[in-house]
Amino acid sequence: MSNHRLPLKTAKDPIGHKFSWLPQFLVNLVTRSGSISLNRDDCRTPMQWGPSINAGFCSDEVEPWLPTSPGHKSLNVRSEQNDQNSLLNCYKSLLLLRKKTPALHSGSLSITDNSNLSKSILSYRRIHNEQAVQIWLNFSGKQIHTKEIEGNPRVLFSTIPETTPIKSHGLLLQPYQGVVLGVST
């Protein structure tokens, strides 16, 4: 779901009221920097359940406390449920994997030495009893090749399921891709 920028002058948030005297161009400048938010209402808009007038958050006859995001007609839970590649289904798949994979929520965690790789890569290994997983996250907009993965890796989850990240020489991570590998201990 997307955040909806709301002018400080219409803020319901008490913190936002403290800054309502600021000119809108200054608010936009501060908000764009990403370092601070003057209006917490931006991320408190009603959940977008469907394409109806109030996004399915409340009946059409009721006015919600905050306005719905203008994009709610196309970006909502109902439309994401039907899209296998949606962020909603990505999270559901990750939660299911976490539920059935003890190493993802218990045991030890060790950060992989990536000193010879891009600073945009984060990798860590989780081990619980005899189960081990290796997580690789590419935070860059570029394809990145990694070193060879030890432990007979197999893909348990990928944010880009149509790709095969395991190559003979290591991993080939697509831009902004995350991969969970099952590996032997």
Predicted regions and their residues:
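A short acidic, often aromatic-flanked loop/helix-cap motif at beta-alpha or helix-coil junctions
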Residues: 54-55, 161-164
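Short helix/strand-capping connector loops at secondary-structure junctions
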Residues: 71-73, 159-162
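A conserved amphipathic helix/loop scaffold
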Residues: 137, 164-165
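Beta-strand-rich binding/interaction modules
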Residues: 143-161
